[in-house]
Each structure stands twice: as C-alpha cells, then as structure tokens.
C-alpha cells in the first residue's frame, strides 16, 4: 500500500485534511536542526537543500567521494573528529510515492519507487543519530579498495535528514525470511552453494564489524539479513547485514574517543551527530543481552546459569562480541539448513524446541543446551565430513561447567531426553550430499568452543 506523506512527516506535521477519503498531511514549518558549535551553520537558501532525486553510485565504490574525513581536534589532540560529507545532509527528503515495508522498535522503513531506495524514518533523535553514525562508518568502508569484498555485505548510505530523522539507503528486495518463503522451491545445488558463499561473506563482514570497527550487532536474525537474488534462477547473489538499532561498542571501538559532525552547507545547517557519551550510552543493557537468549552462545548461557549474568554498562572485548554474533549467524544458517532439508526430504524429520524472545528461566536454558547438544551431535556424527570433535560440546563438558548439582542433574536429564527424541524422530534419516557444505558451515559457526567459532573469519 503506497504511503503519500514523507516517512518523517509525522514529526513536523500538526494536522491533516481529508481529500476523497484519503488522508493528506499539511506539514507546518519544520523546526530548525540543532545547531552545533563544531559545525559551520550556513543559512543561505539552496536548491539542493531538499532531496528530490538520488543519483546511482558507481559500481566501483573506490571512485566515489569519501563520506567521512578523519581529523584531529585542535583543542584536544587525544580526540578525533569524524566529519561527514555535507552533501549527504538534506533539510527534507521528498522521494514520494512511498510503499510501506516494515516497522521495528525504533522506526519504520519505506520504499521509494521513484528513486528505488529504502527510506528509514526513526522515532527518536538519539536512536536516529546512533544508527546513522554506525551506518556511515560501515558504508564508508566501501571506499577502501582492500575492503570491497566486505563492503558488499553492508548497505550504502545515500543521504539523511536530521530534521525528519530519515536515512536514505540502498534498497534490497527481500529479507532472508521472505526470500526463503518465495524461493528455494525446489532446493537446488546452485542455491545451496550461493547460500554458503554469502553466509561465509557475512561471517567475514561480522569480523570486520567487530574487530576493525569496534562494534557488535547483537541482533543477527533472518529479518535483519537482506537478500538480492538472481531474477532468472532465484539464487541469492548478495546478502547484507542490516539494522543497527541495537549495535554497541566493544573493546576495539574508537567511538568513545571521538565525535561525528556534519558541517553545514547552503540551505542546510550543520549538525552534531554523536559524541563520546553517545558511544558509552550505546552499551547494551541487561534486557538487550537477555533478549533472544535462544541465539546466545553456550558460554553466555552457562555463565548466566552460574550466576555470572551480563554486566550492564560494561564494555565487552571484541573477540567476545564477535563469538556471540557469529553464533547468532550460525543459528540462522542452522534454520536455513533444516528448512531446506525438510523441503528436499518431503517431511520435517527434525525435533524442534520452541523458544520465545523473552528471558528464559534456568530450566529452559539447560533444556536448550541439551537440545543443541543432541541435534548437533547427531548431525555431525551421521552427516558431516567436517571432522570436528564434539562441536556442540559433551555432556561431561557442559555438566562440569555448571556450578550447582541441581543444575547438573537438570541438564543431564534433559540431555538424555533430547537424545532419545532426536534418534526417534530422525529414524535413520540421511542428508543428501548436496547439503555437506552448509551443514559443515553451520557446525563451525555454532561450535561450542568460541575460539573455533572465531576461525570463520579466515575462511577462503
């Protein structure tokens, strides 16, 4: 359904009128953007103050102008200032008509048919500035020749409006969940090969995100992975990691030592995007870390069961956050593997454990660990040629890592029950050889040992 008003119009409009049954917003004069001493405010009117069209980017992004320039603060040599290209900043974004794509906890996304771009309108100023900063950092990486293979897994930023809290970015047609609903029917070898290639690329992109950028995603799931596919075959040709609403700094970050500004230009006032305190404020709360615990790695779940829960406001190491997000990516690969196997076998031979996104109690967490152990051990021993030893851990290893006897007893009982369930449900089912690579990749990404998980960044 097309949306006629600008995505951010609700933030500058105070009334609407009806025209033939259709609501048409009458925007009032928008409030001026926040002035910043670091930015040069330019008030002269300019024809380019409003975004009415988007020029396509060069295929070779290294020929595009730099989006961010790094400068040392003259009054504080220990602090860095990231200056954003003023040409990206617009007073208003006018790319109608729009088609609504989806809504999340922090804003909504629309598709501009005229410009063939995605337009994300965020609700709050703080979330807008933070997501813009993270998006610009990873988008700017595409301008470095040596990172061209990494850059394809992130969205390119075309423009933004600080008044309307809007970010204009590349449009990718599907998220992974929608792609799987519409494609891979039937499952082909070429589709599986393409999925493995793109998932490996996403793992390397996560390594760059965590280690080079000092950022953790913390919400890797099917809905946050976007897919472009070959129009003829339906095979995925590009997968992109999207939505940095929950992104946080880790121990490798430089954002807690810098600010990001966008200088002014004719018709558009300069803005202060983030400062050091914004990076510190991005540290994940306990609620975020305990959200979707089913995607958290075993070391995180074991610590939680032992009473060593996440420490709110603490900066985690880059290798710790990388292992966490890689496991979440592995969970996505595992979901894709089981879905595609079910389609090829003509039935769903796998037992499933349903988990909510809400924090779990200890009994559910221990049952989840037991389920992972039973299913992954069966798959690796019966189907995989990867040669990993105990990829999901062992009963003894997990049991010995639990401090309290009642927890150990609960886990061992769940492990025995899940092992019987897996064997009975699988009933001798065998995987076709076409699934060997995606199975091995899922085992690696979900490996019990975080050090093994992290080796994925070195994959060819």
Curated annotation (Swiss-Prot):
- Which ranges are annotated Basic and acidic residues under compositional bias? 12-25
Query: Pfam families in the record, alphabetically?
Result: Pkinase (PF00069)
List localization entries: Virion tegument; Host nucleus
Reaction catalyzed: L-seryl-[protein] + ATP = O-phospho-L-seryl-[protein] + ADP + H(+); L-threonyl-[protein] + ATP = O-phospho-L-threonyl-[protein] + ADP + H(+)
Q: Which SUPFAM superfamilies match?
A: Protein kinase-like (PK-like) (SSF56112)
Q: Quick one: which residues bind ATP?
A: 101-109, 120
Please give the chief subcellular localization of this protein: virion
Stretches for region Disordered: 1-37
State the PROSITE patterns in the record: PROTEIN_KINASE_DOM, PROTEIN_KINASE_ST
UniProt entry tagged with the keyword Nucleotide-binding: yes
Q: Which residues form the Protein kinase domain?
A: 95-460
Question: GO terms for molecular function, please?
Answer: ATP binding; protein serine kinase activity; protein serine/threonine kinase activity
Q: How is it modified after translation?
A: Autophosphorylated.
* Residues at the catalytic site: 219
Cite the entry's keywords alphabetically: ATP-binding, Host nucleus, Kinase, Nucleotide-binding, Serine/threonine-protein kinase, Transferase, Virion, Virion tegument
EC number(s) stated in the UniProt entry for this protein: 2.7.11.1
Does the record bear Secreted in its keywords?
no
User: Would you identify the family this protein belongs to, as annotated?
Assistant: Belongs to the protein kinase superfamily. Ser/Thr protein kinase family.
Q: What else is known?
A: Displays a substrate specificity similar to host CDC2.
* Name of this chain's protein: Serine/threonine-protein kinase UL13
Q: Which organism is it from?
A: Psittacid herpesvirus 1 (isolate Amazon parrot/-/97-0001/1997) (PsHV-1)
Query: What gene is this protein translated from?
Result: UL13
